[in-house]
Amino acid sequence: MTKLEDLRPTPGSVKPRKRVGRGIGSGHGKTSGRGHKGQKSRGSGKVHMWLEGGQTPLHRRLPKVGFKSFTHKNYAIVNIRLLEEKFSANDEITPELLLEKGFIKKIKDGVKILGSGELTKPLIVKAHAFSNSAKKAIEMVGGKVEVI
């Protein structure tokens, strides 16, 4: 049986730390493996990855495009086809009910009802937004649309 104190790292997997600047006999003395002069020999002499010498950097070569609208709403989407299949006449449908039954993963900024599919029974639908076609389809069969 292997004991915890018997465990050893695989030979060759653990290398000794490189001690630099400890005399010329060590092989890493004087310039500590950095060579002579130049930016990379200095104390904080790193060249950032976005620097490209004298060439115009990529972020300045590419045009400025678009933006993220901070008023954009990310709705959870439900089509009336789903409401037709899963609910019976005169049911009251709320975002919480849709979430509970697993028709949407999360409410996000609200629920939007879209008009894909046919609706034949009246339903009371409460949601944050409706497409025009969905609103028309729900009201045409005698249902109610309520924006919350």
From Swiss-Prot:
Pfam families: Ribosomal_L27A. Residues 31-45 have a biased composition (Basic residues). Keywords: Ribonucleoprotein, Ribosomal protein, RNA-binding, rRNA-binding. One of its GO terms (cellular component) is cytosolic large ribosomal subunit. SUPFAM superfamilies: Ribosomal proteins L15p and L18e. GO terms for molecular function: rRNA binding; structural constituent of ribosome. One of its GO terms (biological process) is translation. InterPro entries: Ribosomal_uL15, Ribosomal_uL15/eL18, Ribosomal_uL15/eL18_sf, Ribosomal_uL15_bac-type, Ribosomal_uL15_CS. Residues 1-47 are annotated as: Disordered. The keyword Transferase does not apply. NCBIfam families: rplO_bact (TIGR01071). Belongs to the universal ribosomal protein uL15 family. Binds to the 23S rRNA. Part of the 50S ribosomal subunit. This is Large ribosomal subunit protein uL15.
